[in-house]
Design a protein with these regions (language model features):
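Conserved C-terminal guanine-recognition region of P-loop GTPase G domains, centered on the G4
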Residues: 1-34, 175-177, 199-241
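Conserved Rossmann-like nucleotide-cofactor binding loop
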Residues: 41, 170, 221
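Conserved protein kinase catalytic core
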Residues: 43, 189-190, 223
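Conserved P-loop NTPase architecture
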Residues: 1-133
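Conserved G1/Walker A P-loop phosphate-binding module
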Residues: 74-212, 216
Length: 241
């Protein structure tokens, strides 16, 4: 791989699995390119898509939870600065300081999201006894487009992965039956557990739904894999099917 990178003047290598901080550091030093693993790439996409305070808070929490166990490995100069037996070099002291800062920030973000969760619970209670239908599906499958057609409204739509991070709820009247339709974040294969935890308040909309409407793009060559990925994610977030 290193030879291929050098011969083709590549400056970025993306792994479809997660790497430890140490693995990332070793590969970057060996190949002289930036290394991005699967979760890091997904988090970067989420960060670029986050439009509201809630989404930005959820993404930041997931980023910090991803970063915390990788701090040691990401310090490329740590081994050279390590102190002797029973001592700590300056690199290790800085890592401990960074860990405390990250843990404190994680704690603050969790408290902030707890308040958001309570607000979301209050909002759901305020919707009355209407039947709740939640659109689920693989990312970029067309859930928001379907929401716009059914509700005759303009939910943000873009042909990009994870264009929707926040939950949108619309009241729909089908014949004589009114119901609430929600559009949530799209699922993906091997959904990082940091995102599941951070986006709890968003995914709760799926938990609370009376009906799950699984949207599938059968024109996609891998639509069967997408169905499997969505069903697997539902199991991971403990949603009964």
């Amino acid at each position: 791989i290193g030879k291929y990178i050098e011969e083709h003047d590549i400056d970025l290598a993306i792994f479809d699995d997660d790497l430890t901080g140490k693995q990332t550091n070793i590969l970057e030093e060996e190949w002289k390119v930036k290394i991005v693993d699967r979760t890091s790439l997904i988090l970067d996409i989420f960060a670029a898509r986050a439009q509201t305070a809630q989404a930005r808070t959820q993404v930041e929490l997931a980023q910090l939870q991803y970063l915390l166990p990788r701090l040691r490995g990401l310090w490329s100069h740590l081994e050279r600065q390590r102190g002797g037996i029973g001592m700590r070099g300056p690199g290790e002291q800085e890592i401990e300081t960074d860990r405390r800062i990250v843990r404190d920030k994680i704690s603050l973000l969790k408290k902030k999201l707890e308040k958001i969760d309570q607000q979301s619970i209050t909002q759901r209670k305020g919707r009355g006894e209407l039947i709740r239908v939640s659109l689920i599906g693989y990312t970029n499958v067309g859930k928001s487009t379907l929401m716009n057609v059914l509700s005759k409204s303009e939910v943000f739509v873009e042909n990009k992965l994870f264009a929707t991070l926040d939950t949108t709820v619309r009241k729909i009247v089908f014949g004589t039956m009114p119901f609430l339709l929600s559009d949530t974040v799209g699922f993906i294969r091997k959904l990082p557990h940091h995102l599941v935890e951070s986006f709890k308040s968003t995914l709760d909309e799926v938990h609370e739904a009376d009906i799950l409407l699984h949207v599938v793009d059968i024109s996609h060559p891998q639509y069967e894999d997408h169905i499997t990925a969505v069903n697997q994610t539902l199991l991971e977030i403990k949603v009964e099917q």
